[in-house]
Amino acid sequence: MLSNYNKDKGGKGQLMSKNKLLFLPFIVAIIVTLIFLAAQIPSAKVNPKHLPVALVNEDSGEMAALIIKNLKDNAPDAVEFIEYHSVKEMKKGMNDRKTYGGLVIPSTFSEQLAAIQTDNTPVYLDIYINEGVNTNVATSMETSLNQIVSTISSNASKQIIAQLQQVADQMGETVGAQLAKMNEQGGKKEEAADLTTMISPVQPTKVELLANPITATVTKVNEVGKLGSVPSALFVPLWIASIIGAVMLYLAGTKRPFENRIELTKFQLIQSLIPIIFGFFTGYLITWYSTWMLGYEFESFNTVALFASIAVIAFVYMILSFVVWLRLPVLAFFALFIFFGLPLIQLVPEMIPSFYGNYILPWLPIRFLVDGIKEILFFGEGVMNDYTVVLIWIAIGGFLLLWVRNLIKKVESKKE
């Protein structure tokens, strides 16, 4: 009996040990779903804080100063108002991505507001939207600033109506006094006719204007036009092509026997130069594909293609250097960049949760690709912008790491 029990127990143990892979799908499901859902946290928990909005007051009136003060004192947590001395200074801040929108009070604001009772022209406030930073933020920023202008207009309307009510009350008292005097002395018809013009200080045609005296004019800075989706569209194919290129170059030299150090060095030299050729080929090819298949029309095709080529060169060197040191399993780390990077590049830093903003975003090399394309397409920069310099340094670092590994690699002789 005991021997049979031990046999059964041993058989079950062998069965379990031989079928460990049966539990692998459950483990993979736990890990993969956790990673993919964690990558969506920035998009699911968008909580904008301190989005920079410019304020420019070109008017010297008390009303304009009061508007600026009230906006700064009552700013919500999602917005941070920053004062600029001029529209030119504000636009420079927008080009430097320091502000996403702006509200400008023109120099004629107080004058036009004071003359609105006699003039049929509405008073204007100028809204500026920095569309090139992020199209989603630009849309919400335009809506928010229009709501602010609507609130300012409503408050101004109440003040104007209150002033007109005081004038009407004074006129009523004057008319009452005149009528009483006419009743006592016997008024003339001509005098009674003149009193009809004093009954209401507001012409019927101005009622709608006085109800909404202030309107907004919207000016978009660094417009995206039909190219708003280009950074996201180019990011995935360029990154995947870089991973594939690096893997192919690595596999070309694995377990390949060499007769001597000279033969190995020749191969390593070719291997370290091919990323440059591959980068230009891939960068121009994908950029051309985007014009052919997606219908993008670039102002300068060569500028976009050249920047894309530099990005691919940098990424291939970086990935290849990691692979030669840490082997193929490190590719999983770079593959995750797609899932974690895509939600992050669609948001501005002020909308990203603090953990992702502090510990993940700074280590995403793909953000230099996305921001560099934005600089070229929306901000009027050339190929050599700040992000290009970073990509070049990434390429240099990857190249050096690759050659450090090459120099310490031992020669594997050919087997007879």
Whereabouts are the PLM-identified features?
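Juxtamembrane interface at the cytosolic side of transmembrane helices
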Residues: I243-Y284, W288-M293
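Long, hydrophobic alpha-helical segments
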Residues: V230-Y250
